[in-house]
Amino acid sequence: MMGVSRHRAIGVDTENVTRSPASMEMAEHFCSRNEIAQLRSELDENRQSERLLDFWTLKEAYVKARRMGLSIPLNQISLSLPGSRGIEVAFDGSVHDHGDNWAFWMLRPSADHKSAVCVARSPGTTLAFAVRSAIPLVMHQMITSAITRKSE
């Protein structure tokens, strides 16, 4: 998966959902307190693992957009996935950022993969987001059903 942006920072991360499931032990290392509470409220281990992978993928996209690598403490980024389609983000003061500065999308490009995209926002501008399947110099087509969640 590749992201293209004109004049804006962009980060993209893709994870294979068929890998061994993520665990709560793993969550203790990179999740915020709020995220851990959300994970614990999930009764089903499969749902916990799925949500944990959502958090990881979104955080990786953000870190890539910021171009600071893992020097950003991931447990200081707090994500919430309200309803069935929303994404909200908040940052601890040590991250020196604000959730309104970023737009997020989650996608399901295939049955075995989930992806996240993070793009810097500018006040007073609207972001256009499109997903395409492409084989360079051969074909490309829009994909509309891949987007599963987005920030407002």
Segments (PLM) and residue ranges:
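Core catalytic alpha/beta fold that binds nucleotide/phospho-ligands
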Residues: M1-E152
